[in-house]
């Protein structure tokens, strides 16, 4: 009997059945975000953007894949210059390009979309992303950082644009909190995910 078990194990190992069982299940949740480092309002000069920190917390709690919208042409690092560029993009309804594409888009059922609120608006580069992919049948969940404007009108704007998706209630966290209070932000995220009925 022991010889038979040993023989079966040898065959299993040689045929690669064990590695097949050991493969990780592909994630069905994706966190996509745009974030800006450098000089930020109310937090000074930072190495990692506020929304990036928030997005990574969400990805960790949801065991999700993560994709950062990295602009082809970088935004200025100083606040006033970045303000000028963003204002001009809003005025002209620009669609800034970003680096790379999302692989296996169809495997994701749930997509978190993160961004800072820039002068009352979603940054235009996020529109570039939202207009590039088919969200039909997906669940979309916005999240954002801000310094007093909350979600502004971003929830409504996303609902109006992504009509084929189910858009759940988003979460807005002050950028200063996301930047400096990881524990508090993690608690906010956990409570929010529970409220909108997502397992963690």
Whereabouts are the PLM-identified features?
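Positively charged n-region of N-terminal signal peptides that target proteins for export
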Residues: 1-4, 8
